[in-house]
Curated annotation (Swiss-Prot):
Coiled coil: none annotated. Component of a complex that binds and activates STK11/LKB1. In the complex, required to stabilize the interaction between CAB39/MO25 (CAB39/MO25alpha or CAB39L/MO25beta) and STK11/LKB1. Disulfide bonds: none annotated. Pfam families: Mo25. It comes from Homo sapiens (Human). This is Calcium-binding protein 39-like. Belongs to the Mo25 family. Found in serum of 50% of patients with acute monocytic leukemia. GO terms for molecular function: protein serine/threonine kinase activator activity. SUPFAM superfamilies: ARM repeat. One of its GO terms (biological process) is intracellular signal transduction.
Length: 337
């Protein structure tokens, strides 16, 4: 029986698809008058590529073709070009690029992840995606691809330990709500997904990171302020971050900031601040400056906490924690000189 060819005459093989896509992206880059035809060819090629990678309702993706396409994407540099030219591609095409990128990133051969290896060797791909937050028309697409990259520890490590990581502090404050929220989702993912890696990163870069982080906690933007406070609570209560928590709660300026945030005009900010404040009070190993601040404000704190968010009548845990803190503060004694 005659073996069916992998690609029929009407279906181009991966090398042809990649070549057509590269050639037409080059036309789009020039921004001359012939872009309509090129744009159409780009759309068709992306569709064909997606069909090879994802299959269709009728058939599974052909393994051999997927391997060929992946190899072509790496060797031709097209994976990089697709990110670089994302702004030139139409709306549906941008969605296709995201799907193709994430699909090829998940691809494994045994225990190997070839695309993770490729991006590790070409880390500028990660920084192009990160810089995408500065371009509103591609920001959310870049965010989706970036979070897919972060699932892989080697790629998360490259971003965390790069100078560009600090750009997140700027992106989460962007004036466009959707983009700022997306940037925060990526930022949070980076700081919570790979626990041991993150603990190591925070310990090595404590001063720099927390200096930037403090600005988020004092942001004029309510959403940024609330999300940052909530994430801070998660970070210092994670057992992997014990050393970071110990350092954070030893510093009097951090306690003062939380005491101010307990009095914020927003009840939600107050509530998130409470969850960080309680760590200072509940710690059995308070530093002397922390004890002194709590003693200096002892009567005021007891009175304040007694009536703090009394409307939360259905939250038993909150009531228990509040009573525990009141007792801890009441029992504080001046140490003999």
């Amino acid at each position: 029986m005659k073996k069916m060819p992998l690609f029929s005459k009407s279906h181009k093989n991966p090398a042809e698809i990649v070549k057509i896509l590269k050639d037409n992206l080059a036309i789009l880059e020039k921004q001359d008058k012939k872009t309509d035809k090129a744009s159409e060819e780009v759309s068709k090629s992306l569709q064909a590529m997606k069909e090879i990678l994802c299959g269709t309702n009728e058939k599974e993706p052909p393994t051999e073709a997927v391997a060929q396409l992946a190899q072509e994407l790496y060797s031709s540099g097209l994976l990089v070009t697709l990110i670089a030219d994302l702004q030139l591609i139409d709306f549906e095409g941008k969605k296709d690029v995201t799907q193709i990128f994430n699909n090829i990133l998940r691809r494994q051969i045994g225990t190997r992840s070839p695309t993770v290896e490729y991006i590790s060797a070409h880390p500028h791909i990660l920084f192009m995606l990160l810089k995408g937050y500065e371009a509103p028309q591609i920001a959310l697409r870049c965010g989706i691809m970036l979070r897919e990259c972060i699932r892989h520890e080697p790629l998360a490590k490259i971003i965390l330990f790069s100078n560009q990581f600090r750009d997140f502090f700027k992106y989460v404050e962007l004036s466009t709500f959707d983009i700022a929220s997306d940037a925060f989702a990526t930022f949070k993912d980076l700081l919570t997904r790979h626990k041991v890696l993150v603990a190591d990163f925070l310990e090595q870069n404590y001063d720099t990171i927390f200096e930037d982080y403090e600005k988020l906690l004092q942001s004029e933007n309510y959403v940024t302020k609330r999300q940052s406070l909530k994430l801070l609570g998660e970070l210092i209560l994670d057992r992997h971050n014990f050393a970071i928590m110990t350092k954070y709660i030893s510093k009097p300026e951090n306690l003062k900031l939380m005491m101010n945030l307990l009095r914020d005009k927003s009840p939600n900010i107050q509530f998130e601040a409470f969850h960080v404040f309680k760590v200072f009070v509940a710690s059995p190993h308070k530093t002397q400056p922390i004890v002194e601040i709590l003693l200096k404000n002892q009567p005021k704190l007891i009175e304040f906490l007694s009536s703090f968010q009394k409307e939360r009548t259905d939250d038993e845990q909150f009531a228990d924690e509040k009573n525990y803190l009141i007792k801890q503060i009441r029992d504080l004694k001046k140490t003999a000189p």
